[in-house]
C-alpha cells in the first residue's frame, strides 16, 4: 500500500504542474539490487507491486485528483484532444454514512492541461 500511495502521488504532482514547472520525471532506484519492500517499481524477481498500479492510476489519460498542498480538485487531460463540458463531482460522507459535502462543476479541458475545478469545503 505504501508503494502504491508514494508513486501515485509522485505522478499526480507531475500531472498537477503539467508543463508549468515540470516537464519530466526521474525515478531513482527503480530496479532493486536486493529484495526490498519499498521504493522499487518491481520486485527483485520481476513481479509487479503497488507501484505499478499506483503509477497506472495516476497516469490515466483523463484523471481527477485531489491536490493536498492546495486542497484543490484538478482535472488532468493527458490526451491530444479537447474535452468541453467535463463534469467533476465530489461527495464526502462521514462515518455514519451521512453526506456532509457535495459539489459539482462543469469545466472545459484543453489538450495536455490540468484544470482547477474547485476547492472542496471540507468540514
Where are these regions (language model features)?
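Intrinsically disordered, low-complexity Pro/Gly/Ser/Thr-rich segments with frequent PxxP/GP/PP motifs
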Residues: 85-123
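Substrate-binding clefts and catalytic carboxylate motifs of secreted carbohydrate-active enzymes
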Residues: 1-84
Amino acid at each position: 500500500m505504501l508503494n502504491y500511495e508514494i508513486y501515485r502521488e509522485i505522478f499526480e504532482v507531475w500531472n498537477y504542474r503539467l508543463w508549468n514547472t515540470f516537464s519530466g520525471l526521474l525515478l531513482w532506484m527503480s530496479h532493486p539490487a536486493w529484495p526490498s519492500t519499498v521504493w522499487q517499481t518491481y520486485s527483485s524477481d520481476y513481479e509487479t507491486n503497488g507501484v505499478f498500479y499506483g503509477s497506472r492510476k495516476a497516469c490515466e489519460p483523463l484523471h481527477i485528483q485531489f491536490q493536498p498542498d492546495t486542497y484543490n480538485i484538478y482535472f488532468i487531460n493527458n490526451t491530444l484532444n479537447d474535452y468541453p463540458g467535463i463534469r467533476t463531482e465530489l461527495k464526502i460522507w462521514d462515518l455514519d454514512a451521512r453526506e456532509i459535502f457535495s459539489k459539482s462543476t462543469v469545466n472545459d479541458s484543453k489538450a495536455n492541461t490540468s484544470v482547477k475545478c474547485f476547492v472542496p469545503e471540507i468540514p
